[in-house]
Amino acid sequence: MAVKIRLKRMGQIRAPFYRIVVADSRNKRDGRSIEEIGLYNPMTDPSTIEVKSERVQYWLGVGAQPTEQVAALLKVTGDWQKFKGLPGAEGTYRVPTANTKPPRIPGGGAAKAVEAPAEAPAEAETPASES
């Protein structure tokens, strides 16, 4: 049985995301898979790549062949270099950090409204403690 590591298309029309799966090469693209080993979402900025590295190493070790697209993703995450014993096993993919800035609102009216209630309770406590 020839086993491939390939992309399984999911999502809606014009909004695809992919599961990285291990499947028999004779099965259809979106058909039955043996195991799901990752996710790839090209629609986010930057693209999201999640790979179960242990399972990828296992399947590559037992002879599963990645498709060209999956091989490119594995090179970005560093799993291909780790399997081949090449330098650069840390990969070039960086996990996107959470955006800590508050959303920018035109006019800034909502941002001021959020700050005003925070100041009001502090002022209300001061006169109460003086009495």
From Swiss-Prot:
Record's Gene Ontology CC terms?
Answer: cytoplasm; small ribosomal subunit
What GO molecular-function term can you cite, just one?
A: structural constituent of ribosome
What keywords are assigned to this protein? Ribonucleoprotein, Ribosomal protein
**From which domain of life does this come?**
Bacteria
Q: Where is this region: Disordered?
A: 87-131
Q: Which GO terms describe its biological process?
A: translation
Ranges of biased composition (kind: Low complexity)? 111-131
Q: Which family does it belong to?
A: Belongs to the bacterial ribosomal protein bS16 family.
HAMAP family to which the protein is assigned, alphabetical: Ribosomal_bS16 (MF_00385)
Protein name, UniProt field: Small ribosomal subunit protein bS16
